[in-house]
Amino acid sequence: MMSKLGVLLIICLLLCPLTAVPQDGDQPADQPAERMQDDISSEHHPFFDPVKRCCKYGWTCWLGCSPCGC
């Protein structure tokens, strides 16, 4: 009985190897460099003032840009 299970296990592993299953390293959360390229930082925000290093208008707080004195 055990030898039949062993043979079945080997056949299953040969047909579907463990490398075909996505590993944890393949997840987007584990790749911070690629995730940072997709993020829109406040420097690229349309209301960002590069001199003051904040947003020009206070009402843009909810748009993802840190406001100037909000």
UniProtKB/Swiss-Prot annotation:
The source's superkingdom equals Eukaryota
Can you quote a single GO CC term? Answer: extracellular region
State where the protein is found: Secreted
Q: Which GO terms describe its molecular function?
A: ion channel inhibitor activity; sodium channel regulator activity; toxin activity
The free-text tissue note of the record is: Expressed by the venom duct.
Question: Where in the sequence is the signal peptide annotated?
Answer: 1-20
Q: How is it modified after translation?
A: Contains 3 disulfide bonds. They are not added, since framework IV presents two different connectivities (I-V, II-III, IV-VI and I-III, II-V, IV-VI).
Q: What is its main location?
A: secreted
Family, according to the entry, reads as follows: Belongs to the conotoxin M superfamily.
* Record note on domains: The cysteine framework is IV (CC-C-C-C-C).
Role of this protein: Mu-conotoxins block voltage-gated sodium channels (Nav). Blocks reversibly sodium channels in molluskan neurons, but has no effect on sodium currents in bovine chromaffin cells or in rat brain synaptosomes. Induces paralysis in bivalve mollusks (Mytilus). No effect are observed on fish (Gambusia) and fly larvae (Sarcophaga). Is approximately 6 times more potent than PnIVA in blockade of the sodium current in Lymnaea neurons.
What is the name of the protein in this document? Mu-conotoxin PnIVB
Q: Which organism is it from?
A: Conus pennaceus
